[in-house]
A protein has these predicted regions:
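Flexible "arm" and connector segments at domain edges
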Residues: 1-55, 59-102
Length: 102
C-alpha cells in the first residue's frame, strides 16, 4: 500500500461514518489517548501485534483529527519533518534532546 492512498482511504472511511463532522476534536483527542494507552500496554507486554495495532490506530485517529481541523495529515507530517531534519542534539538516557534544550 502507498502511504498517500492509505490516508485517502482513512479520510474516506471517517467521512462515511460521520467521524469528521459528527464528532468533535475533544472526542478525537480522547480517542487518541485511549489508543496511546493500548500502545503502552502492548509495549509493556512486548506484544508486537498490540504495538502495531496501537501505532496504526493512533495514526488513524490523528488523520481524523487533522481532517476535522482542516489540515491534511500529510502536511502535518511534512511540517514536523522539516522542523527536525537538520536538528542537532544528543542522546541522554536513551532520549534525543535537541541542542536548544541542552
Amino acid at each position: 500500500m502507498k502511504t498517500y492512498e492509505d490516508f485517502v482511504r482513512i479520510r474516506g472511511w471517517a467521512h462515511q461514518r460521520n467521524l469528521v463532522s459528527g464528532s468533535t476534536t475533544d472526542k478525537q483527542f480522547l480517542k487518541l489517548i485511549e489508543e496511546v494507552g493500548e500502545l503502552a500496554a502492548g509495549l509493556a507486554r512486548k506484544d508486537d501485534v498490540k504495538i502495531m495495532d496501537g501505532i496504526g490506530d493512533a495514526v488513524v485517529v490523528l488523520t481524523i483529527l487533522a481532517e476535522q481541523l482542516g489540515f491534511s495529515i500529510e502536511a502535518c507530517i511534512e511540517m514536523a519533518y522539516d522542523e527536525i531534519k537538520d536538528r542537532k542534539g544528543r542522546m541522554i538516557d536513551g532520549v534525543f534532546v535537541k541542542e536548544a534544550d541542552l
